Amino acid sequence: DEEVGCFPNVCKNDGNCSIETSTGMTRCQCLEGYTGHVCENPL
């Protein structure tokens, strides 16, 4: 399975993109100091 949801990486500010296997949705693991669905919000 190709993880098309992460190419290109939708996460902002160098967040780490991964695919939720149960839903097929992308999720972002944000670097420290950022929050939001795609790490778009500085803390």
From Swiss-Prot:
Superkingdom of source: Eukaryota
Q: Which organism encodes this protein? A: Hastula hectica (Sea snail)
Coiled-coil positions are none
Alphabetical keyword list: Disulfide bond, Secreted, Toxin
Record's comment describing the protein's domains: The cysteine framework is IX (C-C-C-C-C-C).
Recite the lineage of the species.
Answer: Eukaryota, Metazoa, Spiralia, Lophotrochozoa, Mollusca
Q: What tissues harbor this protein?
A: Expressed by the venom duct.
- Main localization category: secreted
Recorded protein name is: Augerpeptide hhe9.2
